[in-house]
Amino acid sequence: GFDQKEKTFYIWEGVTYFITEQGVNNTLNFIADHSASGSELVFDYMFKSVVDGDFSRFPFARGLFKMMSFHDQHYIFGIDPARGEAFVNERGLAVVSDIGRNEMMKRYLTQSDGTVIGRPPGFFHIVHAKVP
């Protein structure tokens, strides 16, 4: 079981954009308040502008939204990437990194010979945070 006195590594992927801001706040606050110092969290988020329906920078996102809507799935929460670090810090966690598409490709999707094996959408970020 979960022991809040022991360091924990949380992987919270594919969730934040499907729940409310209050749900995100509650989860981040719970982790900050009930986890041992040094515990870590990795989660992804979608840009608030895209969730709000602004597809001007990422036109293909419109198709993704239509497909998800067809399957009765709706994106409801996003974070402004310019405020990503502040958003997480305000909820009691310390950001280690908040990376976008290019850094994701460099770190995780480039083989040793330089071949890129995937291109994530530009409107997602991955955050790595720690409990101070």
PLM regions and their residue ranges:
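Alpha-helical subdomain
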Residues: 1-132
